[in-house]
Every structure is written in structure tokens, then in C-alpha cells.
Amino acid sequence: MPSPRIRKMSLSRALDKYLKTVSVHKKGHQQEFYRSNVIKRYPIALRNMDEITTVDIATYRDVRLAEINPRTGKPITGNTVRLELALLSSLFNIARVEWGTCRTNPVELVRKPKVSSGRDRRLTSSEERRLSRYFREKNLMLYVIFHLALETAMRQGEILALRWEHIDLRHGVAHLPETKNGHSRDVPLSRRARNFLQMMPVNLHGNVFDYTASGFKNAWRIATQRLRIEDLHFHDLRHEAISRFFELGSLNVMEIAAISGHRSMNMLKRYTHLRAWQLVSKLDARRRQTQKVAAWFVPYPAHITTIDEENGQKAHRIEIGDFDNLHVTATTKEEAVHRASEVLLRTLAIAAQKGERVPSPGALPVNDPDYIMICPLNPGSTPL
């Protein structure tokens, strides 16, 4: 019995058909749309499907892995190429069985790039302040989305899909009827999260946010470019939020998994790149309680400058950059350090009393005499 006749169809046309008839029914449709557009930029997209061989697929793989991402200036990651090959493999399987445009799947036998260990990008306190200020001034909706991500660890798609009828502000719960892993989830809303949501016009029904996935992606890209923040993805905020949950020390792994929606503990491990200084208090059980309190009152780097006052005298100004508007001025350096220590101590104590999160100490520039460490508990030990 002769083989069925192959219908000629270019890979580019097949990708378009796949997006319209198959991908459109998937949760990751938007991501597959982006990947499809990438693939169509390469010569392989002009070939008919039945002419594409394993060599062509391997060549595409190697070309992609050798390229530099123009946004980040870094090589295209193996995970990115794996996802593109997964799209092609799914396309060939559908086309082979249902469309008759090829007899084999050339992607199946090609080696896939190794899975990376995952991103461990953390949001710095400076980046958090700058983004928060930028969004607050430019767009209230972006401001709320940004802080909601840090408070809840929700994915971008979950936040953009929030509806008022699924949010219980009184009891502090946001219901997600459909998530990435196909299961519903109830997300606890902290007091800060509820306060941010209440900044939006509250309705009984409808979407909380008006952004589409592509619209928000563009807004995020513009913000990070204007603020010159490099290699920060919105999904990194989820990683940051989950890491902060671990750093609180009051939630166990199962509770954090219930909040984040992770159904695999192995997946959750990659989100736990905890800052070492916040784990010190657990190393000595005998001093655990003491160190738990002391962890709030750690030294912070500060910039010290000499300024001219209106009376013509010199003065010393100290600014602790990890906090907004935290600075002091005094006639002597010793007095300025002492005042800065007192102000820092008061700021940290108020935050501890209210249970508010404080920024982590930034890095101290190496061999820069204009930077010193301000100790809130012992100003006399602060190096001048």
C-alpha cells in the first residue's frame, strides 16, 4: 500500500496554523507566539516540513546557543532554546498525525541543551526603591502590580488575571481558579497586599488590572531600561518574594509551597538562595533569640561628604542610601556618625515594632574613603 501523499507546507506556515488551531487553547499561548516569531526569523522556517532533517534542527540549536541576547548582552540560555525545540517537536507531532505535512519528527533525536540550575537573581534594595518610586509617579496600576508580586509571590499571569469577585479583602484571600500547573489556589494577602489592592478602584466584578501580557511586558521593559536596571525579569520578583518568605523564618516549606503554588519540593529548592547574614542567627542555638533581635540592627553602608553651610563653615553630611531620605548633618565627623547611628537605630526599631520589612544592607564600595559603615547599636565601633 503506497504511503499517503505528503502535503507541502513550509515551517513558517505550519507555525501559523499551529498557533491558530492548537496553541490558542493552551495556557502558554502568548509565550508560544513569541517563540514562534523567533523561529520564523531563521532560514529553517522557509523549508518545507518534510524536507527538514535532524541536521537542520541541530544547526538551528547551535546557532541559537551561539547568539547574544540583545536585551541582556548575555548568551541565549539553554532553557530558552529547549523551549523553542519543544514547540517545534509538538508542531511536528501534530503535523505528522493530523496534517500530513511530514512523516517523522526530526526534533526527537536531536540532543537538547542542558537544563540550567535556574536564575537566582535577587532584587536589590536600591532597585526596589527606584522601581517603586518610578511606578508611583508614572502609573498607579504598575505600582500596585509591582508590590503585589513582592507580597504574594504570584506569577505575572496570575496577577493580570485577578478578578474582584475572587478577592476577599475582609479575610485577606485571593482565589486563583486557574494556575500554571492546572490547579486552583488560594493566596493569602498580607496587610500590605490588601492596602495596595485598595489603591485600585474596587468593584464587585471584573478584572483588577487592565494590562495584557504583551502590554505589561513592554511597560516592564521600558521601566527597567529607563532606570538602567540590567537583567531583571518580572518573574524574578516571584523568586524574591519566595526567598523573603524563607528569610522570615516563621513559615515552613509546606506553607510556602501552599502560598507559591509549587507542587514539587525540588522546584522550590531553587528559590531558596538565602542571604547568609540572615541565617547566622540559626547557627548558635544558645543565642538564637538574641541574634533574632540583633538581626534587625545590622550595620548599613553610608556615604559621607563635606559640605559648605550658609554661615561659611564646613559640615559633614552622612546619607544611608538603603533608606529614602535618611541623612544627617553635623559640624564634626564624629558627631555626624553618632547622629546617623541614632537615626538608623530609631528607624529600625520602629520597623521592628510594626513588623515592617527593612531593606537589606547594600554592598560597601571597596577602597572608597567616602563610604563608611554605620552601626545602629554601637556608634563608637563605626569605622571612620
Curated annotation (Swiss-Prot):
The catalytic site is made up of: R155, K180, H235, R238, H262, Y271 (o-(3'-phospho-dna)-tyrosine intermediate)
- Source organism per entry reads Escherichia coli
- Record's protein name: Shufflon-specific DNA recombinase
Give the protein's function.
Shufflon-specific DNA recombinase.
Where does the secretion signal sit in this chain? none
Q: Please name the GO terms that the record assigns under molecular function.
A: DNA binding
Sequence ranges assigned to domain Core-binding (CB) in this UniProt record: 9-96
Keywords assigned by UniProt, alphabetized: DNA integration, DNA recombination, DNA-binding, Plasmid
CDD domains noted in UniProt: INT_Rci_Hp1_C
